[in-house]
UniProtKB/Swiss-Prot annotation:
It is a single-pass membrane protein. GO terms for cellular component: mitochondrial inner membrane; TIM23 mitochondrial import inner membrane translocase complex. Its main location: mitochondrion. This is Mitochondrial import inner membrane translocase subunit TIM50. The keyword Transit peptide applies. The gene is TIMM50. Residues 143-286 form the FCP1 homology domain. Keywords: Membrane, Mitochondrion, Mitochondrion inner membrane, Phosphoprotein, Protein transport, Transit peptide, Translocation, Transmembrane, Transmembrane helix, Transport.
Amino acid sequence: MAASAAVFSRLRSGLRLGSRGLCTRLATPPPRAPDQAAEIGSRGSTKAQGPQQQPGSEGPSYAKKVALWLAGLLGAGGTVSVVYIFGNNPVDENGAKIPDEFDNDPILVQQLRRTYKYFKDYRQMIIEPTSPCLLPDPLQEPYYQPPYTLVLELTGVLLHLEWSLATGWRFKKRPGIETLFQQLAPLYEIVIFTSETGMTAFPLIDSVDPHGFISYRLFRDATRYMDGHHVKDISCLNRDPARVVVVDCKKEAFRLQPYNGVALRPWDGNSDDRVLLDLSAFLKTIALNGVEDVRTVLEHYALEDDPLAAFKQRQSRLEQEEQQRLAELSKSNKQNLFLGSLTSRLWPRSKQP
């Protein structure tokens, strides 16, 4: 009985395992050939990707077309508006049209030529000075006209823009401004010629010169715009170039007349600065010596990195030479006096009866 029960249990377990294997085989699909599997995979991927790629490929191109159309419409509308606004005849105070040289042309040609002329004149206004004579004629007697003209830049020469947490942005006055104006006003006609706009510079000049030493003020619109720089053309000042000195911290500012300028280093806001005092001594020396043409003097300092330092060195050297000459002259005078007294003692003059 025990042996038969063991055999029966083994047969039952074998039948169970066989049924499981049969079910597994029936559930597993039969193997396909490699070519057939690849074809089916490509079809499936095509079906899966087809509907997704179509919107992605057509969407950006459609958006680009719409953007181009809008840009074209805006550009055309802007061009038409500009031609319409700036292409009309100018009008007088009563609203009547002022005739010009384009009245005989067709209407469209009139509009285009007037628009072109407007922008050409505007560009010329930016590049060229506002007038060929920026200053009025020199004063005549009985009024006093200083013999020389001093042209000063405002920013970097007289003022420094700085920022602090307590005050924010502000312009700081350079030490020695009052001394410079007081010493040079009788000898030089002082003109502020700055590359700043008038709206910015006018109140600054008022604060720098409360006593009215500055004769004239010129701003950015009076400069000549060249290669990205605002150039100060001395030929437009209505003054003799031989007696004009330009002081700036940029050599490009007087590039048209390089031997009329003194290039200083930009002031960094140091309160112990003494450059304006040295500048006053330098310009005062030129004026007191009655130099006929300042260019002959300034030409010697044109290649110097620091013209005022070079002037001080030459001045100290000349003072040493002058002291040495005076010492030698005093020594020779003492020797002559000693020989004269010795001669008078050895050969006394005969007394007149």
